[in-house]
Amino acid sequence: MRRERKNRIGMGILGFVMALALFAAPAAGGEIDDLKAQIKALMERLEALEAREKKMKADMMAAQEAARKKAVATGDFPGSWKMPGSNTSVSFSGYVKLDAIHDFDQDLGDSFFIYDWGGGGSAIALDGGTSEPKTSLHARQTRLRFDSLTPTGAGQLKTRIETDFYGGGNALRMRHAYASLGPVLAGQTWSTIMDENTYADTVDFEGPVGVIAVRRPQVRYSQAMGKNLTMQVALEDPNAPTILTASGTVSSKERMPNLLAALRLSTGWGAINVSGLLGQVRYEAGAVEEDLAITALHLGANIGLGKDTRLWGTFNVGQGGLDKTMLGASAAAVLDANNELEALDSMGGFVGLTHNWSGSLSSGFYYGWVENDFEESAKAAHPSLSQSLQSIHANVWWSPAPKMRVGFEYMHGWRETNGGDEGDAARLQLGLVYSF
């Protein structure tokens, strides 16, 4: 089109010049040559302008194509995007949580720390102690999560890194850091003995006594056994089980990982899981070397009772295997007067009922309990450790906007020590959660 226009312009100029030559007085030969030169110059300028216009359009199209290639592409799982120049999909998510807490009896910490852990006694003060109510606020449960997915010839390579701020001095703390390829997972994540599908949804960070909520470095193999049934086998870090001695506590000398196995059934009406642990406790001091096998069994379920109501529960029993695993287990083993190890028997669990009142309002009630079976000599040596623990959590959750939850919870805990003393404590907590 532009070439035809240029030709028409050129022909018009040429016709005008010829008309001048016919109807004007005869011109000198030099003047005609000047006109020809001017016409040639005009034609060259037109060609240069056209070439410049073509180059500008080509440059613009190239820039648009480059920008398109650099644009962020949607990833292969919800909320993810493709890393430029890669087939790896990544995402960044988490939530911000503010907790406002009032302890009626004494400061129990940023979570409702009423349970024994690793040979340390409960934070609940015994009857007759000083009452010191406290109000506090913190945001330590705030969570950051990074996920990735990369297709490979061997299957999908998935990774997750997740942190919160429960490290010392509000520092970042690693919660999860693992990779999985096909049926194999390696890294730190929830212990194979527990199941997230049967965990209490409390405003408090920990939940009731008797629950299992631990993460362990591990290597895990999972295999589907049918449409809804999965089998898992894992080797996990034993996390230095606690041994009670006549003078205090010591950590087990770790020589081998714990062996765990689980069966998980997940259906439309709920979930059931059965899991077990086999490990070892070892004591070494001078010429004394003792080792002992420890075990634990976990049963968990959540069952729908109609459309909006759900029943939750777990039961745990162990011979030393629940130490640093179940909230409330005091230790793994006791070293007796003959320098022989004896496993500490513990059992516990929780039961809960939740109900959805509407699309934005729900409530829950949970009761947890733990029993530690100490021998008389261990009771005498460790009178402040808890023989029994109980706790209740009653809460209401409200979602006023998408990705926002407001929770209000009352909790109360009781304990009885090996020495026969008792104590209890109560707390109110408000939690504001903003997910992203």
Question: Where are the regions a protein language model picked out?
Answer:
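Detector for outer-membrane/organellar transmembrane beta-barrel domains
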Residues: 265-386
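Bacterial N-terminal signal peptides
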Residues: 12-23
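N-terminal periplasmic/intermembrane-space "pro-region" immediately following the signal or transit peptide
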Residues: 27-109
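N-terminal secretory signal peptides that target proteins for export/translocation
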Residues: 1-10
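Transmembrane beta-strand segments that form the barrel wall of outer-membrane beta-barrel proteins
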Residues: 156-167, 235-237, 272-280, 362-371, ...
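Outer-membrane beta-barrel "beta-signal"
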Residues: 398-400, 424-436
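Outer membrane beta-barrel
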Residues: 78-241, 253-271, 302-306, 310-317
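Outer-membrane beta-barrel translocator domains and adjoining extracellular loop/strand segments
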Residues: 106-110, 166-174, 197-203, 238, ...
